């Protein structure tokens, strides 16, 4: 659908008229994805969150703490469908207990984590992009920077090939890491 919409746009045709699938196929209303962003992935609930956003919240807690209802980690999400054929991207905001932690401390930790590639060189405009993550199993992290309004808080941009790096592959990698660390 993305490819057809892009061609229709370039040919001067009305993309809206042919939209049939997004944001969800079962809905009455559809929008084109080409040259557009859709802040809805899956069905929107009365809470204002979509199924995909709830899944992201619960899966993060499950992966991090093995408990999708954990209160120890605070997670929220806004999922946006973007016009790329492969890869997901996430803008992540997080806090650390040690408020004296620096951007370099976070970069060092990220760079040493298995399966993660640090791409963070703002002077040379090096940062993760979906087009570069396609076909690779690694997760790419960059644009790490402090939140100057909140000590101990940081932002970063994460990209991975969603066809290769999903919840199942992450589970395998997490298990391998736990075995390596003699934790299981």
Feature annotation, model-predicted:
Residues 69-184:
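C-terminal active-site/capping subdomain that shapes the small-molecule cofactor and substrate pocket
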Residues 1-108:
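Active-site-lining helix/loop region of Rossmann-like oxidoreductase modules
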């Amino acid at each position: 659908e993305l490819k057809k919409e892009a061609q229709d746009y370039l040919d001067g045709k009305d993309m809206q008229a042919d939209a049939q699938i997004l944001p969800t196929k079962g809905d009455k209303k559809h929008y084109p994805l080409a040259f557009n962003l859709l802040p809805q992935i899956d069905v929107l609930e009365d809470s204002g969150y979509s199924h995909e956003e709830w899944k992201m919240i619960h899966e993060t807690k499950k992966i991090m703490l093995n408990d999708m209802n954990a209160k120890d980690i605070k997670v929220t999400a806004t999922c946006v469908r973007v016009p790329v054929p492969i890869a997901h991207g996430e803008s992540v905001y997080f806090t650390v207990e040690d408020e004296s932690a620096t951007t370099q401390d976070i970069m060092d930790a990220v760079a040493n984590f298995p399966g993660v590639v640090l791409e963070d060189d703002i002077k040379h405009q090096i940062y993760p992009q979906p087009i570069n993550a396609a076909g690779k199993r690694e997760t790419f992290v960059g644009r790490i920077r402090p939140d100057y309004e909140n000590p101990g808080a940081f932002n970063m941009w994460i990209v991975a090939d969603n066809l290769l790096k999903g919840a199942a592959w992450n589970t395998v990698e997490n298990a391998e890491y736990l075995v390596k660390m003699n934790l299981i």
